[in-house]
A protein has these predicted regions:
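Short, exposed coil/turn segments at beta-strand boundaries within extracellular/luminal domains
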Residues: 43-52, 127-134
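Aromatic sugar-binding surface patches on proteins
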Residues: 5, 11-26, 108-110
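Feature responds to low-complexity, polar/acidic, surface-exposed segments characteristic
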Residues: 59-62, 138-160, 168-169, 173-221, ...
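Surface-exposed, short loops/turns at beta-strand junctions within beta-sandwich domains
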Residues: 27-34, 116-120
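Short, aromatic- and glycine-rich surface loops/edge beta-strands on solvent-exposed regions
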Residues: 33-43, 122-128
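Extracytoplasmic soluble-region selector
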Residues: 58-145
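Extracellular acidic, Ser/Thr/Pro-rich low-complexity tracts
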Residues: 1, 43, 84-86
């Protein structure tokens, strides 16, 4: 029940009445008293005591969260326990920082059972007031796992996660049933096809270029890109869909696409830190300055943009995922 007790720092004290300092506490609860954390605890023999801790004092002796694993599939449950070995059964409280990813099904002072709801990352904390420890939990995305398994040539690739996202969002497809070809140069046809998908595959009514034949994967996308002014062709008649896209061409086409979507493209970065900025074609100067300002395109180093170099499929996936995220943030 409730009792009168004196609080001093330095460890557990039995509940008792003291003439100099009185606090009325309920057993099984935690309190902040001045700069002390006061915890009501029950020892293994069932005796109720109070422990007072200095602010910032290590709580490792009283809280140690453990579970069989930390990576879950959606729908899977897991029990997290306080496994700290000491003479006191601390009644800790549990919290979850992302209820969209995890839910706490049940908990008591010693353990907590969670269920994975959706892919993502979350952490479960257990402790007393501000004195808590956390256990990070990852909920796997089965679709991302499937994509990663389907394209072994992106395993351990620096752009692996962005490539998976680009495929998952329907922007990119593989170059074969089991190949993505991340280091292959992106072609003009591939770029406009990806942007066409990003735009929701709108229909095109105008004529295309003479070298864009019917029935190719890029046919409708190129017609749409020409009709909207996204691309102008190498000549008015020829597009060269299988030619590689340079980094400055990529910036220019993405810039036009953003304008087509009604985005503000006025943000311009100072490119003087890049020693090869002078090699940018005139048409690509503002687009590249915008893309760098918004963090969509970064230099291949701190001093090099390499505007004339071909963009790889991996680089394109990264840039387009950044754009996808940026566009969503503009609408927020």
């Amino acid at each position: 029940g409730n009792g009168m007790l004196a609080v001093t720092a330095g460890g557990p004290l039995p509940i008792h009445q003291d003439s100099s300092s009185f606090y009325n506490f309920g057993v099984g609860r935690n309190y902040i008293v001045g700069d002390k954390l006061v915890v009501i605890a029950t020892d293994r023999a069932g005796n109720t005591s109070v422990a007072a801790f200095e602010q910032g004092e290590a709580m490792g002796n009283y809280v140690n969260l453990a579970a069989e694993k930390t990576i879950l599939d959606p729908g899977e449950t897991l029990t997290i326990r306080n496994t700290a070995e000491n003479q006191y059964d601390m009644q800790i409280e549990w919290t979850n920082n992302n209820p969209e990813i995890l839910e706490i099904l049940e908990s008591d002072g010693y353990s907590c059972t969670i269920r994975a709801l959706a892919p993502g990352a979350a952490s479960v904390s257990g402790g007393f007031g501000p004195y808590a420890k956390s256990l990070d939990i990852t909920v796997r995305d089965p679709e991302r796992e499937r994509i990663a398994g389907q394209y072994p040539d992106i395993a351990n690739h620096w752009a692996r996660e962005e490539i998976i996202t680009a495929i998952q969002e329907g922007l990119f497809r593989g170059t074969g049933a089991n190949t993505f070809s991340p280091e292959t140069a992106l072609t003009q046809g591939q770029l406009v096809t990806v942007l066409h998908r990003l735009a929701g595959t709108p229909e095109a009514t105008g004529s295309s270029f003479q070298d864009v034949v019917e029935g190719r994967y890029y046919t409708e996308a190129v017609a749409w890109a020409k009709e909207t002014g996204l691309v102008k062709g190498v000549t008015p008649e020829r597009f060269y869909p299988n030619s590689p896209v340079t980094r400055e061409q990529f910036a220019a086409i993405l810039y036009r696409y953003a304008q087509l979507q009604g985005q503000d493209v006025s943000n311009q970065a100072d490119l003087s830190a890049y020693l090869d900025a002078g090699k940018l074609s005139h048409y690509a100067q503002s687009p590249m300055a915008w893309a760098v300002a918004e963090g969509l395109i970064r230099g291949v180093s701190e001093t090099a943009l390499c505007p004339k170099a071909s963009a790889t499929r991996a680089q394109a996936a990264v840039i387009l995922v950044r754009y996808f995220t940026w566009e969503a943030s503009q609408a927020a």
